A protein has these predicted regions:
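Nucleotide donor/acceptor-binding cores
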Residues: 8, 118, 192-194
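Cytochrome P450 core scaffold surrounding the K-helix E-X-X-R motif
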Residues: 50-55, 130-131
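Short, P/G- and charge-enriched loop/turn segments at secondary-structure junctions
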Residues: 87-93, 136-142, 148
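Short, Lys/Arg- and Gly-enriched loop/turn segments at beta-strand edges
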Residues: 127-138
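Glycine- and charge-enriched low-complexity intrinsically disordered segments
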Residues: 150-160, 166, 177
Length: 216
């Protein structure tokens, strides 16, 4: 795990807009994990609507059209000041990718060395409470760099060990879709009962089916 390069390949998001805002690079500095963080060699990274919406700036309050209207060329009415998931201007260039499966290859101060070599999934949305906002959140690939590169850093406490026969690609489809579905089921207080899940063919819908089945 010591053969960590200084540079890596990845995709930069250079601003809100169309596909031209995505730039593939092979000279991106490999990040260094800070205290409480781990460096992850990315093995799989899912693409979901949050990545697309963030690129477009669709979360801006000025946007009234749907994402299909600007998927390739971008949207015209975006205000960069509130175009992110958290209403905070993004810092560019940004590496997107909120769904991350990988291997811990280096740890920062305060993180146990025995975590190196662990296969993990990263929680996509992470609580970062402040005095003024106890519910403040950050999203991988939005407020901080995500998994669309060979390496990324994440908080150690948000990187969960996985012991599973699923492939890296399969596991990379889990974090956002399953956490969204679980939140919906918890909010609806689903117990052992028969329910109808509409739109069940997508990532969140299919996750909701599996999580509902676990409840009996």
């Amino acid at each position: 795990m010591n053969n960590i390069p200084k540079l890596m390949s990845g995709v930069y998001l250079t601003g809100h807009g169309g596909l031209d805002k995505l730039v593939y690079r092979e000279d991106i500095p490999v990040p260094t994990p800070q205290a409480g963080e781990v460096l992850i060699e990315v093995k799989g990274a899912g693409v979901n609507n949050t990545d697309i919406n963030t690129r477009l700036g669709w979360y801006s309050k000025k946007v009234t059209s749907d994402t299909n209207a600007g998927g390739r060329e971008g949207l015209q009415e975006v205000d960069d000041d509130d175009a992110s998931w958290s209403d905070v201007p993004l810092q560019f260039p940004r590496i997107q990718g909120g769904d991350i499966c990988g291997i811990i290859v280096q740890v920062g101060e305060g993180v146990e060395q025995n975590r190196i070599g662990t296969r993990i999934l990263v929680r996509s949305m992470q609580n970062i409470p402040t005095k003024d906002n106890p519910l403040a959140m950050q999203t991988m690939g939005s407020e901080v760099d995500g998994g669309f590169a060979q390496y990324c850093v994440a908080k150690a406490k948000e990187s969960f060990p996985i012991n599973c026969e699923w492939s890296d690609t399969e596991l990379a489809s889990i974090p956002i879709s399953y956490s969204t579905a679980e939140g919906m089921l918890c909010r609806a207080d689903i117990q052992k009962e028969t329910i109808l899940i509409t739109g069940a063919s997508g990532g969140v819908g299919s996750a909701a089916i599996q999580l509902a089945k676990v409840r009996g």
